[in-house]
Amino acid sequence: MNLNATLIAQLVVFFILAWFTMKFVWPPIVKALDERAKKIADGLAAADKAKADLALAEKKVVEELRKARESAGDVRASAEKQASQLVDEARAEASRIIAQAREAAEAEAGAAAQRAKEALRDQVAHLAVAGAEKILRREINAQVHAELLANLKQELQ
């Protein structure tokens, strides 16, 4: 009988220990485990959120780089267009200056040719008078001489 009484006593002690453990020990352990699980879940959620934020930031960076490249391309195209426009304007200005210089040179050449013709006419008139004077071997009156030169000059024109 001792075996039965010991067994019953051990069962009673076991149930008291189980009840005590369930009442006082188990709730703090469960609470600690729940808190730990919550911290782990929060950490995983934060990691997932950080990963999503990183992906979003990478997308933003890629978009900003694309915009920057586009903007750089636009700036480069604008600069090339402006440079081309400046070159065209410089060419037009150079053409205008060359045309003006050509016109001025042609006008100067025409004026020089006209002056040369006038000088040549004067020389021809003087030579003709000198030749006529030598042929006639006589002195011509200065007034008559001037009239002859003017008439000869008019005829040569």
Swiss-Prot record:
Matches recorded under CDD domains: ATP-synt_Fo_b
Which keywords accompany this UniProt record? Answer: ATP synthesis, Cell inner membrane, Cell membrane, CF(0), Hydrogen ion transport, Ion transport, Membrane, Transmembrane, Transmembrane helix, Transport
Please name the Pfam families in this protein's record: ATP-synt_B (PF00430)
Where does the sequence pass through the membrane?
7-27
Could you tell me where this protein is found in the cell? Cell inner membrane
Which InterPro entries is this protein grouped with? Answer: ATP_synth_B-like_membr_sf (IPR028987), ATP_synth_b/b'su_bac/chlpt (IPR002146), ATP_synth_F0_bsu_bac (IPR005864), ATP_synthase_B_chain (IPR050059)
Write down the membrane topology. Answer: Single-pass membrane protein
**Tagged with keyword Transport:** yes
Chief subcellular site? Answer: membrane
The record lists its disulfide bonds as none
Q: Which HAMAP family match?
A: ATP_synth_b_bprime
Protein purpose: F(1)F(0) ATP synthase produces ATP from ADP in the presence of a proton or sodium gradient. F-type ATPases consist of two structural domains, F(1) containing the extramembraneous catalytic core and F(0) containing the membrane proton channel, linked together by a central stalk and a peripheral stalk. During catalysis, ATP synthesis in the catalytic domain of F(1) is coupled via a rotary mechanism of the central stalk subunits to proton translocation. Component of the F(0) channel, it forms part of the peripheral stalk, linking F(1) to F(0).
- What is known about its subunit structure? F-type ATPases have 2 components, F(1) - the catalytic core - and F(0) - the membrane proton channel. F(1) has five subunits: alpha(3), beta(3), gamma(1), delta(1), epsilon(1). F(0) has three main subunits: a(1), b(2) and c(10-14). The alpha and beta chains form an alternating ring which encloses part of the gamma chain. F(1) is attached to F(0) by a central stalk formed by the gamma and epsilon chains, while a peripheral stalk is formed by the delta and b chains.
What family classification does the UniProt entry report for this protein? Belongs to the ATPase B chain family.
The entry's protein name is: ATP synthase subunit b
Organism equals: Azoarcus sp. (strain BH72)
Upper classification of the source organism reads: Bacteria, Pseudomonadati, Pseudomonadota, Betaproteobacteria, Rhodocyclales
Gene expressing this chain:
atpF
